[in-house]
Curated annotation (Swiss-Prot):
The keyword Transcription regulation applies. InterPro entries: PRibTrfase_dom, PRTase-like, PyrR, PyrR_bifunctional. This is Bifunctional protein PyrR. GO terms for biological process: regulation of DNA-templated transcription. It catalyses: UMP + diphosphate = 5-phospho-alpha-D-ribose 1-diphosphate + uracil. It is an enzyme of class 2 (transferase). It comes from Microcystis aeruginosa (strain NIES-843 / IAM M-2473). NCBIfam families: PRK05205.1-5.
Amino acid sequence: MTPQLIEILSADEIRRTITRLASEVIEKSGDLNNLILIGIYTRGVPLANLIASQIESLEGVKVPVGAIDITFYRDDLDRIKTRTPAKTKMPLDVTGKTVILVDDVIYKGRTIRAAFNAIIEYGRPQKIRLLVLVDRGHRELPIHPDFTGKKLPTAAEEQVKVYLQEIDGKDGVELIK
């Protein structure tokens, strides 16, 4: 059977969602000079850059952006295909900072748990918050986003695919049934 593709967010809707998420981060974060955005490879990194760019556009504050690879922090290394780790890039020490971890989709919560472990190796943040473009539910761990672009209840066998211009040459979110 051919998979059915359903558009969830168009390019324009992603742009508006990023603007809204940036506004929420500004509103709920207080001191933007104490803020660091850290994107999870792969699509969390360009999302973090887009959020930071929007914050700068709205508030005139350049928020540092880092990128973190969680490959060696995963708890399912025995079940995933061999993957070459990406390079973690941290803008500065996270100690005492508010870190906003950015990812494209949250599902079971295991990627986020791995990212928490990775971040702690770079210092002790004052707090870690989570921003996701899509929350599809089905958590196995007690992890919930502080900032959510779109809540999308899904069946376990369905997939959510995020496309970003910087990686995929287009912007959009699709549900694959």
